[in-house]
Amino acid sequence: MNMRAVTLIAALCTTATWAPARAQTVETSVVKFPQDIVYKGLPGAPQHVTLYGDSSQPGLYVDRIRFLPGMKVMPHWHPDTVRTVLVMSGTFYFAVGEQWDESKLVAYPAGTLYSEPPRTPHYAWAKDGEVILQITAIGPTGNVAVAPKKP
């Protein structure tokens, strides 16, 4: 077999493997305009909206979380295998640990991207005003509260 034939066969095989990925991307396209994003949540709790996927199921999902000014999130963790967080607006104060310790909080301004390793306890505060986060992760997810240590 000459080199030209080998190259042609390799190109056809490669192109054939791309077709399902392209088709799948088109079938799962999602568009969310700002006016279509409606946050929901209980009073006193962070508000939530799912932009893509289903965080209760295995697979990729994208959520936005809105924290009202002054809202504190006590130590907890998530089971996601991969979890990245983008601070979209506001300044988010974040720390890793099982106990609330204000001195360990680090200010993450808008535009900051960070990751949360699986099952790593952390806590946060929307100290200076409203904060909006965008979470991109592999589900299923959940919030597991960390019980405070007794003195």
Where does each model-flagged region fall?
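A short, N-terminal "cap"/entry segment at the start of jelly-roll beta-barrel domains
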Residues: 21-61, 148-151
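Glycine- and acidic-residue-biased ligand/ion/polar-headgroup-sensing regions
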Residues: 68-71, 78-99
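Short beta-strand His + acidic residue motifs that chelate non-heme Fe in jelly-roll/DSBH
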Residues: 73-75, 94-95, 116, 121-127
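Short acidic-glycine-tyrosine-enriched beta hairpin
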Residues: 98-118
